[in-house]
């Protein structure tokens, strides 16, 4: 026979509902192969976040345009992004190609996992993009609140948002599945294309280590196609 232990005193205690409109928290991963629109989808959400929460502090390793933000160029900047406090106004941290930084081969340091796992307390939202879900370190995958599967059909972007806690590998289907929360659909446009550096590339990750002060080297291109180091 199963017994139940009920704390009757707790029913007398006052409960304060969370305030509506507070800065959202949790990790969202945009996944998809090259050309699927995952980076553009993240960029779109960054600008929407800025519109709704104008006082939020934004960190990004993508070079953004016409918006106040802090560029993440090395591990020191990343550490600062994960530790910055901004009260109820929130902090948004955006990492493109996260699988190059936090992969299952190299693992993730405990301090990074600690910062990510305490996002709700810090009013922090983290956006990652990656090409392959399983390339992310498993300790990071366990912290993901939402997985956005990105699909591009012409200039139409169709994204399926999945509950991160429900993601499981289906052996019969041979793929990762999860509970669908909603679909987001938008059309590609010049305003979005011009809101970030579309030529920026991460081409080198061999020098990155969890306990060093180096991250991948960023390159851009001028109109003639000449490579330019982004400092």
PLM feature segments, named:
Residues 48-57:
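Post-Walker A helix-loop "phosphate-sensing" segment adjacent to the P-loop in P-loop NTPases
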Residues 30-32:
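Hydrophobic anchor at the beta1->P-loop junction of P-loop NTPases
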Residues 65-122:
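Conserved nucleotide-sensing/catalytic segment adjacent to the nucleotide-binding pocket
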Residues 146, 160, 166-231:
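Conserved P-loop NTPase motor module
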Residues 3-23:
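Pre-Walker A adenine-sensing motif
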Residues 38-39:
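Conserved lysine of the Walker
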